[in-house]
Amino acid sequence: MSNPLSPLLKPAAALYRTVVRMRNLGFEKKLFKTWKAPLPVVSIGNISAGGTGKTPLADWIINYCLSVGSEPALLSRGYGRTTKGVQLVSDGQRILLDSREAGDETSMLAARNPGIIVVVAEKRKEGVEFILKRFGTRMPSLIILDDAFQHRQIARDLDIVIINAAEPYCNARMLPEGRLREPLGNIRRAGLIVLNKITDRNAADAIACDLKKTGIPVVLAKTEAGELVPFGEDAGERNMNGIRAFAFAGIGSPEGFLGSLKEKGIQVEAHRFFRDHEPYSGDKLLPILLEAEKKGLSLVTTEKDYFRLLGEHELTATLSVLPCYYLKISTRFLEGEEILASMLNKVIFS
């Protein structure tokens, strides 16, 4: 889709491209140091800004590690959080921060995986050092860096990059004109590419063929819609097929959310989307609640938004007595799951 502000944003995008190129050159020429952690490190990241299905893939990787007897720790920046510096979200026994303090995606992964250590830190090296010091007697088997492809200060044993099959090349435009965080050619730093959110297999195969020219293994996956979960007990159980809904969310790729709802047989008659990680307030939700009530619509949002709303206790209490649901999602591999498993095994058992 063409950006009407593109002519105005081109100079800023050109400047950003130059800064990114110089920074990467600094790492390649060893002008900037890369720190090697004493634990294996797996990085999961994007070359574009948001909307690639990274969080459910991170959840899959965490569960795979646990299934083979490895105990990972998750280290994230914690986008959208109100706290600063290094913060312990979960010590593997209890969750210590709410979604406002930890960030919505981090809270979601901590809740899904209550037995793992979860830390947030803007400076990932400080986060790793905190884990090493705090959990010296209960050291994790490896560190999973969430959203860290551009964070080159820490060396990694496996660098996974996720690409949205619906928008694989982002019109080759850098931020802020487009969605690219760095030039497409930099994907060659990756050890594995996951082509995700596939809805058209033929189109995905063509994209994968192009990506494989880099010599990097490519895995094909889709973000699969799961069950609809009520916010509270009063919402009740019901057959969701054919439900008339007002969808709302603050995510990077709302089109994918609408597609998932359609897969579930939900009729979306109205929707409202906010910026990714945008905080909720009563002023933002009240018009949605009023319109949904007027039209007799159920409210449906994403699991990530559910965790963001949990930090707003009054809003959550209100939504819990309404027909309000969140959609769970997961990653399902279409091709190459064994490649990812083999690469993870090499990191875990080397």
Swiss-Prot record:
Keyword Nucleotide-binding on entry: yes
Residues binding ATP, per UniProt: S48, A49, G50, G51, T52, G53, K54, T55
GO BP, sorted A to Z: lipid A biosynthetic process; lipopolysaccharide core region biosynthetic process
Entry EC no(s): 2.7.1.130
Gene Ontology CC, one term: plasma membrane
Disulfide bond annotation, renumbered to this chain: none
Entry's Gene Ontology molecular function annotations: ATP binding; tetraacyldisaccharide 4'-kinase activity
Catalytic activity: a lipid A disaccharide + ATP = a lipid IVA + ADP + H(+)
Lineage: superkingdom: Bacteria
InterPro entries: LpxK, P-loop_NTPase
Signal peptide segment: none
Pathway: Glycolipid biosynthesis; lipid IV(A) biosynthesis; lipid IV(A) from (3R)-3-hydroxytetradecanoyl-[acyl-carrier-protein] and UDP-N-acetyl-alpha-D-glucosamine: step 6/6
UniProt keywords, alphabetically: ATP-binding, Kinase, Lipid A biosynthesis, Lipid biosynthesis, Lipid metabolism, Nucleotide-binding, Transferase
Stated family: Belongs to the LpxK family.
Function of the protein: Transfers the gamma-phosphate of ATP to the 4'-position of a tetraacyldisaccharide 1-phosphate intermediate (termed DS-1-P) to form tetraacyldisaccharide 1,4'-bis-phosphate (lipid IVA).
Name of the protein described by the UniProt record: Tetraacyldisaccharide 4'-kinase
Species annotation: Chlorobium limicola (strain DSM 245 / NBRC 103803 / 6330)
Annotated gene: lpxK
